[in-house]
Design a protein with these regions (language model features):
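Conserved hydrophobic/aromatic pocket- or pore-lining residues that grip, position, or stack substrates
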Residues: 10, 26, 58
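Short, glycine-anchored, charge-dense loop/turn motifs used at functional sites
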Residues: 33-37
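Short beta-strand scaffold segments in enzyme catalytic cores
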Residues: 25-31
Length: 127
C-alpha cells in the first residue's frame, strides 16, 4: 500500500475542507484492497457539532460501508495527529494501522492546541 499517496490525499481533502468553510483536517479509511471506504473532513463549525472531526466522520462512513462497527484490516490516514476524542473512536473502531501527516505540535503552532485536555508534563509525550 502506498502510504504517501493516501497521506497526500488527506492533505488535499483538508485544503478542500478549508475552501468549503470547514476546519483544516481530513481523514480517509482504506480497506485491505486499497479502496477508500470512508472520507471525512472536519465539519465542526458547519454542523455545529463538536464531534464532527475528520477521523470520526471517516470512521462513521467506513463502518456504514462495511456494515460493521470495527475496521479490521483497514488503515486510517489523517492529515494530523488525532486528538484524544478521535483516538477514542480509533481505539473502538480497531483499524489495523493509523498514519498521520502532521503532529499535534504542528497543529498547536497554527492555533489548534489540545494540550488543555492532557495537562501533563511536556516530557511525557502528552503536549
Amino acid at each position: 500500500m502506498n502510504h504517501n499517496y493516501f497521506l497526500q490525499k488527506t492533505i488535499e481533502l483538508a485544503n478542500e475542507s478549508i475552501n468549503n468553510g470547514g476546519g483544516p483536517f481530513a481523514a480517509i479509511v482504506v480497506d485491505q484492497n486499497g479502496k477508500i471506504i470512508g472520507i471525512g473532513q472536519n465539519s465542526v463549525t458547519k454542523k455545529s457539532d463538536p464531534t464532527a472531526h475528520a477521523e470520526v466522520e471517516a470512521i462513521r462512513q467506513a463502518c456504514q460501508n462495511l456494515n460493521s462497527f470495527q475496521l479490521d484490516n483497514c488503515i486510517l490516514y489523517t492529515s494530523c495527529e488525532p486528538c484524544p476524542m478521535c483516538l477514542g473512536a480509533i481505539y473502538w473502531a480497531r483499524p489495523a494501522e493509523v498514519y498521520y501527516a502532521a503532529t499535534k505540535i504542528d497543529a498547536a503552532a497554527v492555533g489548534f492546541d489540545d494540550a488543555f485536555i492532557c495537562p501533563h508534563s511536556p516530557d511525557d509525550n502528552c503536549h
